[in-house]
Amino acid sequence: MSAVWIAVIAISLLGLIFGLILGYASRRFAVQDDPVVEKIDELLPQSQCGQCGYPGCRPYAEAVGAQGEKINRCAPGGEAVMLKIAALLNVDPQPVDGDEQEAEPVRMLAVIDEPNCIGCTKCIQACPVDAIVGATRAMHTVMNDLCTGCNLCVAPCPTQCISLVPVATTPETWKWDLHAIPVRNIPVEQHV
């Protein structure tokens, strides 16, 4: 019985000592993040698509906040995100990259030519929003509501059976962009 108590006490002391060491190390070696970069990162859509030229939303936020990168390079976020970043940084809004060609951007959707799909799962691994479903050596398909049209699934496909097609805006496919609607709080006078 005494050997059990010695083991319990020894493990408890080791846990306490290691906990104190980890607590000290977390405070001593803490990395302070730039609060502006954090706020910019919160505004970005977090699709990690790479259309801005950076490998994800966090590196783009760091480039905008610390290095003065253009605020108009986020294609999935569009004008709404660009306006929020401009307001946060107190800079003038800029036209979103690619807006010179089109007045209204067309939503793109990945489509898989299912008879040619070999089920290699490379597109599933490349999709940042998990919009592609399927099993190994089985046909894959794209969930239309989740696809952002980021084009990251096209290049890894060995059979070239994935293509991006434009989706026409119809009453069935149109959705509200709630972030583009300005919201104001109007004070209400209370009568006693």
Swiss-Prot record:
NCBIfam families: PRK05113.1 (NF003475), rnfB (TIGR01944). GO terms for cellular component: plasma membrane. GO terms for molecular function: 4 iron, 4 sulfur cluster binding; electron transfer activity; metal ion binding. Residues 108-137, 138-167 form the 4Fe-4S ferredoxin-type domain. [4Fe-4S] cluster 2 binds at residues 117, 120, 123, 157. Binds 3 [4Fe-4S] clusters. Residues 1-26 are annotated as: Hydrophobic. It holds the Pfam family Fer4_21. This is Ion-translocating oxidoreductase complex subunit B. [4Fe-4S] cluster 1 binds at residues 49, 52, 57, 74. Belongs to the 4Fe4S bacterial-type ferredoxin family. RnfB subfamily.
